[in-house]
Regions:
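Conserved alpha/beta-domain cores
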Residues: 1-191, 196-206, 220-221
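Gly/Pro- and small hydrophobic-enriched strand-loop and loop-to-helix capping segments
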Residues: 208-224
Length: 224
């Protein structure tokens, strides 16, 4: 499996580089977040052996089961939390994750700020924007995103560095990428986490700094 994952990583990286160059951007301006959710630690280790270092997990509990041992072997790995975060998992998330991409409500932001103050660890945070205003999804609606950014950054004191979105499956993602880019521009935020296996090249055209790719690297979920 190691050879397959290494080949997949190289293929995705080539596509990222080509998309960046087509958009007039430097290839190294786009970070590939390899989404390892539901895949075993062995698959992550194969990606690490191939030289990749940035990974994304949806659930703190799953990340706790995989990443402490991997970090011992590869201390330069970076772990992004890309799934919804419950307030009762905040302490674990701050301790384990290097970036938290899914800040989406004041109560969570306040809990994160308290834990960062307590622990002295301040992982960069992104605010998740529900660009499609889908009731079943987490994320702040675009209509209140500007105010929420100000609240998190200025009143609560979180290290907000950018925005993240997951467009609706049945809509043209470019519209959502453009919207996220505009909200980030208004607030002076530099990081844009958007684009997945099916649409990351389009996201790069709209300014993505981080693309979250799982299936194109590790295969269908849980295949390992």
């Amino acid at each position: 499996m190691e050879g397959v994952i290494a080949a997949n990583l190289a293929a995705v990286r080539r596509r990222i580089d080509a998309a960046a160059e087509a958009a007039g951007r430097a290839p190294n301006s786009v970070t590939l977040v390899a989404v390892s959710k539901t895949h075993p630690a062995a698959s992550v280790r194969d990606a690490l052996a191939a030289g990749h270092r940035v990974f994304g997990e949806n659930r703190v509990q799953e990340a706790q089961a995989k990443y402490p041992a991997l970090r011992e072997a590869f201390p330069d790995l970076a772990l992004h939390l890309i799934g919804p975060l419950q307030t009762n998992k905040v302490r674990d998330a701050v301790a384990l994750c290097d970036v938290i991409e899914t800040v989406d409500r004041p109560r969570l932001a306040e809990a994160l700020a308290r834990e960062m103050e307590r622990s002295g660890r301040r992982p960069p945070c992104l605010i998740e924007v529900n660009t499609g205003e889908e009731p079943q999804k987490s994320g702040v609606f675009p209509t209140v995103a500007d105010d929420f950014i100000i609240e998190c950054r200025d009143r609560i004191g979180l290290p907000i560095m950018g925005l993240m979105c997951v467009p609706p499956l049945d809509e043209e993602p470019a519209l959502h990428f453009a919207l996220l880019r505009e909200i980030a521009r208004r607030s002076g935020l530099g990081l844009l986490s958007m684009g997945m296996s099916a649409d990351f090249e389009k996201a790069i055209r709209f300014g993505a700094t981080h693309v979250r790719v799982g299936t194109a690297i590790f295969g269908a979920r849980g295949e390992g």
